[in-house]
Amino acid sequence: IQPGDYVVALVGSSFAERVVAPRSKVTKLPKELDTRTAVAAWLQGLTAVTLTHAAYQIKRGDYVLVHAAAGGTGLMLVQVAKALGAHVIGTTSTTEKAERAKTLGADHVLLYKDDIVGRVNEVTSGKGVNVVYDSVGKSTLDQSLEVLAQHGSLILFGESSGAPDPLPVHLLRPKNIRFMCFALYGYLNTQEEYEHFSGILLDLLVSDKVHANVWREYLLSAEGVQQAQQELMSRTTTGKLLIRIPPSPDEA
């Protein structure tokens, strides 16, 4: 990396014009990839890549269930899973969000009010799914366990509906279910790990197998950041909300 290169970094406290990032979490962007796409894709993209390549390695032909399939991470998961050859089933709250998930590759999208277990069994001919990616938590965990196939994997990586009730581990025994509580940074401890997974994500983006989904852009200001936070918490958005830094006077 040289001065003047365009880079993307995984760093906190980034509502700022300048940030300090560790070298181990900075990636040089290829010329084919613009900064807007990289920023929109990076955090959720890395989450999706590690979920599908490490937490559970998706194989061609797998049946995959993605809860909250129209959210930022959900849309990335749908696309990465499809790129790996999976049959993707998503869940979401509205028909509008369902259409968005289908546009980006979901084979079937169910609404939370539907009979999720019955529909999944119908789609999978009663076999269940190989893996469930669950970022919802409390309101979906029981369904997630029920729709899994024999030797299936349940990856919990969020709790948007609240923390699940304590899980009696004996419920995992009948189908030999593998259960994981996922944390992204657990797969990015070293520079080698970060470069490995970021390289996979860059390849997916440059090859157009994965597309960043931008909901809206906001200026870096007190009002802009407040509006973005309020819309994010409303759970009415799909995809990413970006904060844009206004150009400096000499750049305007």
Sequence positions of predicted segments:
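C-terminal hydrophobic helical "lid"/dimerization subdomain
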Residues: 192-252
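Adenosine-nucleotide cofactor-binding segment
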Residues: 66, 82-143, 192-194
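Short glycine-centered segments of the SAM/dcSAM-binding site in methyltransferase folds
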Residues: 6, 63, 87, 152-153, ...
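N-terminal Rossmann NAD(P)H-binding glycine-rich loop of SDR-like oxidoreductase domains
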Residues: 70, 74, 78
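Rossmann-fold dehydrogenase core element
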Residues: 150-155, 167-212, 236
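Short, glycine/polar-rich helix-capping loops at beta-to-alpha or helix-loop-helix junctions
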Residues: 14-17, 92-100, 164-169
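NAD(P)H dinucleotide-binding glycine-rich loop of Rossmann-like/cofactor-binding domains
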Residues: 6-70
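Helix-to-beta-strand junctions that scaffold the AdoMet/dcAdoMet cofactor pocket
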Residues: 59, 148-149
